[in-house]
Structures are given as C-alpha cells and as structure tokens.
C-alpha cells in the first residue's frame, strides 16, 4: 500500500528539516543545485546579510510567541532552512507580496514566489479605444 503524500515526511536530498537546521551552512550548500551553490559560495551581499539578521531576529521573536513582519526587496536570496515557518513580504516592483516559507521552497529564490508581471486583461473595445474604432458606427 502506498502512503498518501500528506503523510510523507519532508526530505531535501535525503535530509529531514531537523537535520538541515542542525547542519552547518557549508554542508548545506553542498546539497544545493549548482546555480544556488555558486551564489551562496560567493558570500552574502549587504542586503542579503541584513535580511538574514532580520530572519534570525524574527526566529527569536517567534519562539517567544510574537509574530514579526519581514519586508524585503532582496529577490535573489536563496531560501535557507532557517527561514521555514516565516512569512516574508517580497517586493515585486509595485507591492510587497507575502510569501509563507514552507520546507518545499528550500533551495529556491525568494523572487520565484513573488511574480513581477501580471496577466493583462483588456477591456471591451469601444469608441475611441483604438484608431480604427473611429470608423465604427456609434450605438
């Protein structure tokens, strides 16, 4: 009998979330795909470092039972195991989109979950909507 997906325990490259949280960053980096591994091996820039400090502070506040809102423009930050459980608001160029971090997001970039473009929904063409509508008979 196959176990339903909801019952399966999350694993990232064979490691449980608890193992990932205890693991040093250098060991975790080796589990990532090449693009993310290269990005993290080059180190964190100032904006990413500030975001990590906010995440660590928010984790401490969560343990006390408080809810902390983190807002960031840093879309190129790789999601780390320490971020799981937090809600980070990521800027998409117009507004901050709340992103609830779940274990399945580990190894992806924050920007992947805050889309910058929306599907354009055009209205009905009417009089003076386009140049060619000048020749449409008025109702």
UniProtKB/Swiss-Prot annotation:
Q: Is this entry keyworded Translocase?
A: no
- Gene Ontology molecular function, alphabetical: rRNA binding; structural constituent of ribosome
Q: Name one GO cellular component term.
A: cytosolic small ribosomal subunit
Q: Which residues form a coiled coil?
A: none
* Keywords linked to the UniProt accession: Ribonucleoprotein, Ribosomal protein, RNA-binding, rRNA-binding
Q: Which biological process, per GO, is one annotated for this protein?
A: translation
InterPro entries, sorted: Ribosomal_uS19, Ribosomal_uS19_CS, Ribosomal_uS19_euk/arc, Ribosomal_uS19_SF
- Name of the protein: Small ribosomal subunit protein uS19
């Amino acid at each position: 009998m196959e176990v339903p997906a909801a019952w399966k325990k999350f694993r990232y490259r064979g490691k449980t979330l608890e193992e990932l949280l205890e693991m040093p960053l250098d060991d975790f980096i080796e589990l990532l795909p090449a693009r993310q591994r290269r990005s993290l091996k080059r180190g964190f820039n100032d904006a990413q470092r500030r975001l990590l400090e906010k995440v660590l502070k928010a984790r401490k506040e969560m343990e006390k039972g408080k809810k902390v809102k983190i807002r960031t423009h840093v879309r190129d930050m790789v999601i780390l195991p320490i971020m799981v459980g937090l809600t980070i608001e990521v800027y998409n160029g117009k507004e901050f989109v709340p992103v609830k971090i779940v274990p399945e997001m580990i190894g992806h970039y924050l920007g992947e979950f805050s889309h910058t473009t929306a599907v354009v929904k055009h209205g009905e063409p009417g009089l003076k909507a386009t140049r060619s509508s000048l020749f449409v008979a008025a109702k």
